[in-house]
């Protein structure tokens, strides 16, 4: 092995980065009012696994539980909704998927 080191070639300047697409001002989404948890707003509403009518409004047509950011529930009530839906599915009060989906 030789003790000689080879010199690295001197770095050249980097080429200019291409401009990002749409370098103009960004379009903003219109202001959307924050959703309010319907269970916090109306204290008379109760989350119950035996009431499939209320639970179906929190399930998609494919049978998935609607997320918090879409339903507008607070985290505490979203957890209760999730537990109630799972209990109702377990004892067959609501179907796991409303229809058979062929993909």
UniProtKB/Swiss-Prot annotation:
GO terms for molecular function: small ribosomal subunit rRNA binding; structural constituent of ribosome. One of its GO terms (biological process) is translation. One of its GO terms (cellular component) is cytosolic small ribosomal subunit. Residues 1-19 have a biased composition (Basic and acidic residues). PROSITE patterns: RIBOSOMAL_S18. Residues 24-33 have a biased composition (Basic residues). Residues 1-33 are annotated as: Disordered. Part of the 30S ribosomal subunit. Forms a tight heterodimer with protein bS6. Binds as a heterodimer with protein bS6 to the central domain of the 16S rRNA, where it helps stabilize the platform of the 30S subunit. This is Small ribosomal subunit protein bS18. It comes from Geobacter sulfurreducens (strain ATCC 51573 / DSM 12127 / PCA).
């Amino acid at each position: 092995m030789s003790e000689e080191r080879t010199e690295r070639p001197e770095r050249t300047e980097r080429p200019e980065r291409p401009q990002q697409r749409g370098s103009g001002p960004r379009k903003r989404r219109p202001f959307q009012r924050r959703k309010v948890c319907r269970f916090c707003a109306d204290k008379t509403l109760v989350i119950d696994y035996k009431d499939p009518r209320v639970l179906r409004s929190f399930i998609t047509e494919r049978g998935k539980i609607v997320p918090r950011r879409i339903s507008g529930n607070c985290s505490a009530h979203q957890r209760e909704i999730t537990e109630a839906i799972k209990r109702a599915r377990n004892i067959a009060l609501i179907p796991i998927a409303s229809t058979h989906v062929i993909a």
